[in-house]
Amino acid sequence: VSIVTKANIMKKTDGDFLQICREVAEEYPEIETDNWFVDIMAANLVNKDIRNQFQVFLLPNLYGDIITDEAAQIQGGVGTAGSANIGRDYALFEAIHGSAPRMVEEGIEGYANPASLMKAAAMMLAHIGYVEKAERLEKALDAADAKLGPKMTGLPGGGTCREFADEVLAAL
């Protein structure tokens, strides 16, 4: 687990966050933790030689929004990334970019890339114990992305939501 802050500058807010993370980490000695400044982590993520060494990030919302969008861009863009918020009693799965109401306002909702919501659905399936079905959906998404990914621009002339969904269904 990599704890990401700017505790060297934001001494109170991020400093407290880092301290609490360290205290909680002591309760779980079997889980390896380290901590990074958000600017260094941003640089690490664009370095293809080291970005794969990171597995789980623990960070405040502001940095989470930035780092997750950066990571999403590396793997295809925010239109392709799912999101999970998992607590003790409840879990919420959604597209990382939200609902994109702008596309409806502009009349281009048919060009929305459904991959992020489908990835969130795969995460949800795994979370509730349907790991095999989640893996099948992930593979179908990869197949659809390999075929249509470059066409999925979110703009007229690009691939449509229906085309992408049809490719996922065909792969399933």
Give the predicted meaning of each segment.
Residues 1-39:
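Glycine-rich phosphate/diphosphate-binding loop of Rossmann-like nucleotide-binding domains
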Residues 7-9, 40-46, 122:
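A short beta-alpha structural unit
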Residues 7-9, 131, 140-172:
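Glycine-rich phosphate/pyrophosphate-binding loop and the adjoining helix
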Residues 7-11, 32-35, 56-57, 110-111, ...:
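Hydrophobic alpha-helical scaffolding
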Residues 15-18, 35-39, 61, 115, ...:
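Conserved structured core elements
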Residues 33, 38-54, 171:
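A glycine- and small/hydrophobic-rich beta-loop-beta segment
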Residues 45-148:
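Glycine-rich phosphate/nucleotide-binding loop
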